[in-house]
């Protein structure tokens, strides 16, 4: 009886957690929040400024840091880029220090003092009435992310 109830519960609840159409969108949002948190910690530990350069057209995130000579370099011995799934695109990025960027390249700076500008990244999958949006708000004092369904502006 217990096994039957567990099976019934799993059958009813698992589809609620994993929606095929939204899985790439949510997976990319989690990847972005994980990368930001990792670079936030790396900046605090190493004492070097880090940044993420986001190419909005290609959905590519380049991860960089300032070396001892003051030059920007890709993160070594680790993945130094993040690319979004083909189904997912960046609608725009708003940052406290640079405003809203809807095309081209946006730069997210992460400072070694344990701070980054408040930032909101808007992701979208699909088009027309079937499009889905996610808003990722990056918190300045912790590097943590709040992920919300829909298109939200957290600025102000």
Predicted regions and their residues:
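N-terminal signal-anchor/signal peptide hydrophobic helix marking the start
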Residues: 1-4
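N-terminal helix-rich module
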Residues: 8, 12-34, 41, 45, ...
